[in-house]
Every structure is written in structure tokens, then in C-alpha cells.
Amino acid sequence: LLGGETAEMPGFYDDGKYDLAGFGVGVADKSDIINGSKIKEGDVLIGLSSTGPHSNGYSLIRKLVTDFEEKITIGGKERKIGEVLLTPTRIYVRPVMDVLSKFRSSVHGMVHVTGGGFYENVPRMFPHAKEGKKQLVAMIKKDSWEVPEIFDELIKRGADPENVFSTFNMGIGFVLAVSKKDAAEILKRFNANAKKFAVKGSPVMKAYEIGYVGHTDKVIKGDFKGSKEMTQFY
């Protein structure tokens, strides 16, 4: 294993029960790996829409939702909240690989927005600044994408509005840092081909320009995890 975690998921497993999971390891030429080292100030951040909470934040969700049979209105239709929360996680491989087939040199960084939301995930693609250099950070425009209604429902049920971006993906499940000169074309390609890569029964993916790469003069040592200096909203 190159890395991993133990998901405790409190309140989910009964005593004596366990979860069996699998993983895959890929091999690539070093020159083909997009590791964030080419990210620079002024790069555009493109966000790809999620289908909902995906597979993260459910320890909190189970505290907020006591009756999964309860009906709520989503998209103008009445649905069971449990059914909405079971919407499958969007897989971004096909649309991202399609963009890389034409714009690989213009894509400088990529990251999934998983557990820990924006604050714990977006900074993962940024390299640590060398001594005396500016530290790159994500500048996120909060109202630049459509937030799925399920997140508003969770806030109504008690999720802290100040902390939802450090728990949930809030409608953006994948972020790319791309060169400014090709950002418009990359965005256009994602949206033009979205229906082709759509999974039956799931909403069609949308791509948004959600911000840009800026910098901070602060020296941030150690792990970027959860650092609010590394992901700033405007």
C-alpha cells in the first residue's frame, strides 16, 4: 500500500462487524504525472459538480437525519431524504481524461474534494513554497456554482453554516488548476461533452470557473490539512 486510512465511521458498524474494501495501483511515466509542481499564481480553478455529499460527511448526516423515509422537496419533486442521500458518487475519470487528451500541458493540478471539504483537500495539490518564496493558495469565489439543495437541507437541520466547507464538498467534487490562456476552452470542453459521459439516473455534470490561484505571505509549515490560509473564500 502506498497510503491509506482506517475509516472508523462511528455509529455505523455493529460490534463484531467490519468493512472489506479494495484498491487499485496505477503505473505512469514520471513525465506524465500531474503533481502540482507547475501550478502558478494566476492559474484558473475549475470545479466539477458533485451529485451530493458523495461518500463523505455521513457520520454528521446520520446525526442530522433521524428518519430516512421522510419526504423532502428536491428539484421540485418530493423524494425520500434517504434516497437523495444515496445518490451515487460521481466518477470523474472519463471527462477528466478527455480534457487531458487535448490540454494535458495546461492542466497543472487536480484534486478530489472528499472528507474535509475544501479546506482539507484543495491545498493538497499545492507545492510547499521554498524559503523566501510566496506560498500559493486557492482563492474561491463562493457564489460561482450551484450548490445542490441537499446541502441547504442539511444546514436547516443543524449543520453549522460556518463549517460546511470543511465537512462537505458543497457541490464541487473535483478541482483543477489550469493555465489562464486555455481555461475558457477547457471549461467549454467539459460542459460540451458532459452529456456524453453522463451516467443514467444521475444529474449531468457541470463545470464552473470557481476561482484562481493566489498567494499568501504567511509561512505555512508542515501539513496544509485544514489550513484556512490555504483556501480562502471571497
Residue ranges and their predicted role:
Residues N35, T51, T66, R124-M125:
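N-terminal low-complexity, intrinsically disordered patches enriched in charged
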Residues E41-E83:
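Acidic, glycine-rich loop-and-beta core segments that form the ion-binding/anion-interacting portion
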Residues V25, L60, I186-R189:
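Short alpha-helical scaffold segments that flank and stabilize functional sites
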Residues L2-Y58, Y212:
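Glycine-rich anion-binding loops of enzyme active sites
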Residues Y13-Y18, K71-L86, R90-Y234:
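Glycine-/charge-enriched secondary-structure boundary and capping motifs
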